Amino acid sequence: TLKAVDLFYQSFDGYRGGFLTNGPNKFPPSMALLLMIRQYDRNQDKRCLEMVETTLSAMKRGGIYDQIGGGLCRYATDHDWLVPHFEKMLYDNALFIMALVEAHRVTGREEYAIWARDCIEYIRRDMTDPSGAFYSAEDADSDGEEGKFYVWSEKEFLEVLEEAGLNLEDRKRILRFWAVTQRGNFEGSNILSEPVPLSEFGADERFVQKLAIARKALLSRRARRNRPLRDDKVLTSWNGLMISALSLAGRVLQEPEYTNMASRAAEFIWSRLYAEGTLYRRFRDGERRYAGTLSDYSLFGGSLLDLYRATLDPQHLMRARELADKMVSNFKPENPGAFYESPPEQKELLVRPVEGYDGVIPSGNSAAIRLLLTLAHYGYEAADYVRLARHIFSHFKGALFEYPQAHPYMCMNLFLMHGIPREFAVTAGSKDDPQYKKMIGHMMERMDPDAIYVACHADMDLNLAAGLPLLEGRIPEKKDTALAYICKDMACQKPEPDAEEFIKKVS
């Protein structure tokens, strides 16, 4: 991980964020940012925080981010993040949300939470099926022109602001803020961006309110245009990433609606795309098709672990374990090594591929490592799961050492492999116990995405809770007061009944 950080820092664009390449395009490096946040969390490496904060700010303020409707575009065609390829992908937005929420968690800066909420609102409004599952993408073109849906002439822009009741001074100031000119910056029209951060623009509370009015009016006007085509396929692996992102946002930002969104999508995948022991890859027009790949099993399985952390419903852990066992059965090679990507049902392949490169999404093997090691730390099949994860790491050892920048998600999982995380168990007779609620609230808001914690109160399904190794012998009765256990490798300290003392010990 240190070598990866060093190499990323060598190519870091300290002025515009992101990482320089030989080509003109810049892609969102969200997985690299997640690795940097983990490294900063553990070692306080200030280079990591610099790369994260500079890049997130530059991307959010650039044309690559939809300043009116929210959501991140596929990539920028310039190094300033100004001119995007206007296609929007579910996975890009999921990873971006994760990076924003994690940045908020480690820095406490409220703007990251605001930006994450804005991106989630785009997903809720435009990318969520009535069933609760998430669509795959939105095209770049409408009416045969790339970006036509998103760009503005100065004339139309000012017309909308005037109709919204904004005075001349406010209109001119908003024009400057979003860098709108008569000449434009994209084929005579304007891609909106924020060249100067809001905090440096001299924006007071009144201007922020006027900006919100303008944004709402522009979004309403834009809704009259012909939208780009939406790809309404429901893909299991990509939904897994968004479920993980929303679960993280729900618990860290204390937004139950985000957790509900994640829960609805997870239930859809489980009930409609998992049947007779097979996870399917795609759902569209009422039909599931194609046996799932390693990426489908590992990313959806991992999302159930993230959903458990947000809901504390042990059913999600049980389901994650079931998927992990199916994954091992379907994709583990005969000899120790990395898992196959293609399902055994795909008979037309002469050789089953093995993939470790973390491209636009984490590789199936990277996500499989996280699923296996997290379940092992929860106490399930610990020796077997750790051994399998170690075999995957061994297979990619040379690639990780030679080119760690191509494997940021896999590098991130080295923390799970070589560092034994602390484990936490909180129990109470009632979910309304004030000490219990305070303990749970701290764990959800402050713990990183790899934290191992369980909780149980006497009002939940105790049969399911009894299946959690960390709760063995600790199932509460109605009369019991709250207790917090701090453990390592399943060995626990004396239970702590006071929430404030518990928070001091774990902070």
Summary of predicted features, one role per range:
Residues 1-507:
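Glycan-recognition and catalytic cores of secretory/periplasmic carbohydrate-active enzymes
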